[in-house]
Amino acid sequence: MRTNPTTSRPGVSTIEEKSTGRIDQIIGPVLDVTFPPGKLPYIYNALVVKSRDTDGKQINVTCEVQQLLGNNRVRAVAMSATDGLMRGMEVIDTGAPLSVPVGGATLGRIFNVLGEPVDNLGPVDTSATFPIHRSAPAFIELDTKLSIFETGIKVVDLLAPYRRGGKIGLFGGAGVGKTVLIMELINNIAKAHGGVSVFGGVGERTREGNDLYMEMKESGVINEKNLEESKVALVYGQMNEPPGARMRVGLTALTMAEYFRDVNKQDVLLFIDNIFRFVQAGSEVSALLGRMPSAVGYQPTLSTEMGSLQERITSTKKGSITSIQAVYVPADDLTDPAPATTFAHLDATTVLSRGLASKGIYPAVDPLDSTSTMLQPRIVGNEHYETAQRVKQTLQRYKELQDIIAILGLDELSEEDRLTVARARKIERFLSQPFFVAEVFTGSPGKYVGLAETIRGFQLILSGELDGLPEQAFYLVGNIDEASTKAINLEEENKLKK
């Protein structure tokens, strides 16, 4: 197999002489192209079709070589619609893989899979470009230290901490606060870690992509007046795009993130929404290329494709890419090959609960269902680990008692259980937190809570020192001192009412 020699090297190779071929066959988004003998393009090379259709409209379609068929023919997958293409049209081999702009110029902008801006804000500086197919960092470059990536969000840092350079799965239905949580993480990494974020919209709804962009502008994550002060670059390949674009848009976003890690030496947050759509697009392309399907109709190369993407998301000695991936579980079947392959790569899972959202507890992260491989005494220390376990035990006991409370009421519980319920309700409310990006809607200023402060707060609740405070004092506050202050204010308000 002729694989591209430039795939592990930044930038585009210099093209001495571009070879041209002719379209031989078109089946949907798949093109067969014949080249002169000895002029065959490499696998993953970008091919460009520039012509005019029968109405005289300009055609500009970029494809990616996937197979070498023999008899000087190659099979390529189009990255945009193939409408208007005809047999015999000229195809130019660019001599390099798809390359996209990288660096500060990408911040605050929206790109498609080819790295072209689609936000009508003018051209982007393309002086620095990277090919989207690159090797994962070598073993010797990897950072082997296990360290927590502090987010400033209490429920995440205490109960399901993120690993620096790790991969986190975000599970949640519509309307439970995925977008707000994503925006808060983007905001906090910029403020606390001096990092930037890249958002890859893989096969998502165009409306959702537009809503996210508007909300980011509203909350200040994207600075319209000075784009370079923005904290995020956006890359979209929506549901209406051909499968080739949806399959590669994750790599485009990852490539932009790699530049910030390797060249700018920053901590980067990479969001992929939705990782299932990446697999789904790969499955469509695999069928179009005539490969024999594997289990449940997925591509036989499912693990390889997932691995080549996930292995590039890691910490090096220069910086880190921490990835948060929304995971759609088809028909709620966790044994489906797509989510099952994804789970193998995840370090933590953040599960959003509709029950908590309906109670008005935001972020609606389920403290019992969310998990992390980092929650071990040798990594986080005994104090953190024991506090987290006691919080979980208290909440679990409260969950077990809820049926009894619903039928018989609180009075039928033992003294010990009543105390557990009271503390669990305080913990539940203290796990809520005002977000910076939600200030516009809530009117409450956002709070970033350090890990040490978070642990201290929960230790005080568990020790019983704060049993005398009303539970509403713990709702939507930052650290525990704010809860004490809020309790005093509530008491004064009650006195005034009387």
Curated annotation (Swiss-Prot):
Matches recorded under InterPro entries: AAA+_ATPase (IPR003593), ATP-synt_VA_C (IPR055190), ATP_synth_F1_bsu (IPR005722), ATPase_a/bsu_AS (IPR020003), ATPase_alpha/beta_chains (IPR050053), ATPase_F1/V1/A1_a/bsu_N (IPR004100), ATPase_F1/V1/A1_a/bsu_N_sf (IPR036121), ATPase_F1/V1/A1_a/bsu_nucl-bd (IPR000194)
Annotated ATP binding sites: G172, G173, A174, G175, V176, G177, K178, T179
Gene3D superfamilies attached to this UniProt entry: 2.40.10.170, Bovine Mitochondrial F1-atpase, Atp Synthase Beta Chain, Chain D, domain 3 (1.10.1140.10), P-loop containing nucleotide triphosphate hydrolases (3.40.50.300)
Entry membrane topology: Peripheral membrane protein
Entry annotated with the keyword Membrane: yes
Example of a GO cellular component annotation carried by this entry: chloroplast thylakoid membrane
EC number: 7.1.2.2
Superkingdom of the organism of origin: Eukaryota
GO biological process: proton motive force-driven mitochondrial ATP synthesis
Subcellular location: Plastid, Chloroplast thylakoid membrane
SMART domains: AAA
Matching Pfam families: ATP-synt_ab, ATP-synt_ab_N, ATP-synt_VA_C
Family: Belongs to the ATPase alpha/beta chains family.
Annotated protein name in UniProt: ATP synthase subunit beta, chloroplastic
Source species: Oryza sativa subsp. japonica
Gene: atpB
